[in-house]
């Protein structure tokens, strides 16, 4: 007796759309909701799902400002980062200072420690030492000066004798450097949407190649 064996063809598994945490001082800006909506559309076009910090903060708007509310937000944001496959970070200077938003820097380090792919974007293409130089002049009326010792991460120091570090980087090397070590880069454009578009396109390609 002969016959044809039935071949079981496995069903194709649905493609999982990678989730990307959208981090930055954008949450503090007057048009935050509208801006995140724009960035989410750009994410969709790139083939990923953008997740804003607000997406995990249901009910927070009903809580009174204070330490308890702030800590709750930090807890909820951490849960969102744990769920996401990668992160994209705004490295714009914060509150007219040379450095980026410190909370965003913490989030960047947190996701870097998880080994997740990262990307960055900014509208300010000046190198970090130049940002420090401009800030010191405008805020304190002083200037940078050359260091007498060689080596380290900077050849200049400020009026307080602190090294102006991270030469060759847009921000502190511990932030931009972690992005580079994950395989990404920081995109620069005068338009925040275009800078984001360039960065998310690269991050999406890396994330989708893993799925």
Curated annotation (Swiss-Prot):
Pfam families reported in the protein's UniProt record: Nuc_deoxyrib_tr
InterPro entries reported for this sequence: 2'-dNMP_N-hydrolase, Nucleoside_deoxyribTrfase
Location(s) in or outside the cell: Cytoplasm; Nucleus
An annotated GO cellular component: nucleus
Entry keywords, A to Z: Cytoplasm, Nucleus
Protein's GO biological process: deoxyribonucleoside monophosphate catabolic process
Keyword rRNA-binding: no
UniProt name for this protein: Uncharacterized protein C191.05c
UniProt organism field: Schizosaccharomyces pombe (strain 972 / ATCC 24843) (Fission yeast)
């Amino acid at each position: 007796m002969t016959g044809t064996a039935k071949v079981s063809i496995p069903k194709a598994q649905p493609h999982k759309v990678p989730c990307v945490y959208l981090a930055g001082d954008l949450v503090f800006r007057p048009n935050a909701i509208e801006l995140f909506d724009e960035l989410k559309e750009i994410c969709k076009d790139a083939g990923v799902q953008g997740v804003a910090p607000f997406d995990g903060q249901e009910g927070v708007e009903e809580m009174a400002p204070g330490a308890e509310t702030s800590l709750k937000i930090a807890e909820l944001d951490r849960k969102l980062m744990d769920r996401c496959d990668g992160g994209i970070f705004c490295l714009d200077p914060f509150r007219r200072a040379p450095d980026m938003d410190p909370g965003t820097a913490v989030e960047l380090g947190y996701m870097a420690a998880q080994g997740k792919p990262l990307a960055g974007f900014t509208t300010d293409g000046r190198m970090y030492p130049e940002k420090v130089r401009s800030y010191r002049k405008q805020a304190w009326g002083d200037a940078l000066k050359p260091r007498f010792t060689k080596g380290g991460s900077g050849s200049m120091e400020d009026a307080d004798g602190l090294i102006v570090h991270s030469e060759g980087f847009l921000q502190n090397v511990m932030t931009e450097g972690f992005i580079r070590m994950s395989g990404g880069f920081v995109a620069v454009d005068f338009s925040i949407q275009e800078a984001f578009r360039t960065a998310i396109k690269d991050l999406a390609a890396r994330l989708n190649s893993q799925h």
